[in-house]
């Protein structure tokens, strides 16, 4: 239970929430508001949100989908993109950005001050700075977004 998490897990990174002041109920919160509320209220270690507004600033480029996977016939990434929407389109990197933070830390990001995240019964997320808070959320400047996009492309297109 919580004791094992507290002993073994340093930080939980979640792609969830929105902290830009527009107050939407972000999809990953909205799909199960009570579960999201329980996580932010009871998680025993640090919690970092990679919010909606971060992902839309870091978009995986259609040019990479169209050009960087030619080495494999019917590459599953290319086929998934084609099945989802007509090409070409850039796609927000919500989950890849959260994964990069979870694995590599804050090299590519800004990180909020410590605080407390709350989730309303309608699914909106709010953040209040507090000195002993265990919650944070990620941000990117335009320069960081461009560098992170390039980094994600480099990771995704790497041939093993």
Language-model features and meaning:
Residues 1-160:
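N-terminal acidic, glycine/proline-rich low-complexity segments
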